[in-house]
Amino acid sequence: MNFAKYLEKYKVEWLGILVFTCLCHSSMLLSSSVGIDTEALIADREGLYKGWMLTGRPGLVWLKSLLVVDSFNPYITGVGTIFFVVLSCILWTYLFYRITGQENKCGILAFSCIFSAHTILKEQMYFKLQVMELAVCFCLVAVAVYLSHQFALTKKWYYGVLSLPCSIIAFASYQAFNSLYLFGAIACFFLYYYFHCLKEEENITGKQLWFYILRFSVCFFGAFLINQLMTKLFFSGSGYLNGQVLWGQESVGACLFNIGKHMLKVLLGTQIYYAKTFGVYFLLLVFFCAGLLLHHKEKKGKYLGVIVLILLFLAPFLLTIICGGEPVVRSQLVLPFTLSFMAYALFLFEIKKERYQRILHWSGVVLGVLTTCILLQYTLLLNYTDEIRYQQDEETAFAIMADIDRVQDEEKSYPVVFIGGHPAALNSSCIHGETIGYSLLDWDTKVEPQGYFSTRRIVGFMNALGAGYTWADAETVQTVKAQCGDMTNWPMEGSIQLVDGVIVVKLGDLEE
């Protein structure tokens, strides 16, 4: 069926998924709360865009211009993000349907609910300054992978050419989409091999399968190389991942240990960002794929079936391998997609005995519901945590601003320096994520030169609340920092002083 008929057939399911996605994310996305980095979009938009260009992320700037959302508007951003997340689920599941030819209502629900409820997606939702653009990129990668698949299958060159702009914009927006494209490509070959090649009467040769892989590779590497060349010629290289790469900083053995440790954490689900059912899904996938290979042992190219299964496991850990250890959580966007895909694929397997088929079906349903419920619990707790954090940040910021105004000269505005940090006072029901739960007044306090970058962030946040402060330069920060050792910590008397023409606010003691 074509795309319009696909939408029509599952319109009730998509409406339910839209409501579910709103439940997961609307309380955060549709609020006016400000998180880390978002204050820069409000207080220093041009500086933020320049920073994106300097770190090789021009795609975000292009998309903001294209979507006409270059200023902070949480309501347009929130509605747009929810829409594009649901649209990405529609596009990906339609791609899977076109490859397998199998209608899969339970798979659609499992894929979409697990993906929407995933805590890694929630961590990315926290960054409102870019979240709608990244949701658009999920859609762009789905379209790019679909067009690449059509090129690999039909050999029609224009499909490959059309895939390039979609891939390039996504790759130029966030480096994690390289991994997502690769996993999407491997997922396509997995579906094509296990649910098309093995089941068709036509005996597809190993040579044909290798050419399918080759044409897919041309699409990926073409987009990747164009993006790399464009970045080097017109923008600066990104240091986003460079700071996380441990190869060369630690021994090879230590890096291999770090990689294995992270893989084990994901498989066992030992923290809130890694689902406890990930390993179960993968083992089930291996079991049923092995059964298919044994059942169709007369087919050629069986070794490719084994290879694609190995790649399906390794692809989510591409960033882990590149970094030589666990990358930041928000860059692991491929993991929610991987888990969702495995949940979808489980419903595609068929067993001849009806009784066993029913057991498989209901096992998939139970596992999907269990996974969604576990993820949803943490996602909603992260929503609540951020709400409490922002209330604390806003109240504290207004109190500090009132104290600064009492020191500020009416005729002259002095630059402001913040020393130390002030953590949010969260309650016992809150949970800390990687960034969620941490105060804007207590971020970057350990980054050298200490006091400078944290001051820029705090001043940016206060300016987003309506203040008109300026921050001191790095040299001035170091000078006044040496003179504030005897100052008390805010909110004590004497915690805000005018020192050498600079207002110094001591929030806490600096760590050595």
Which residues does each PLM region occupy?
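Hydrophobic/aromatic-rich transmembrane helices and adjacent perimembrane loops
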Residues: L319, G324-I351
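Membrane-interface transmembrane helices that cradle and orient dolichyl/undecaprenyl
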Residues: V141-Y159, Y194-E200
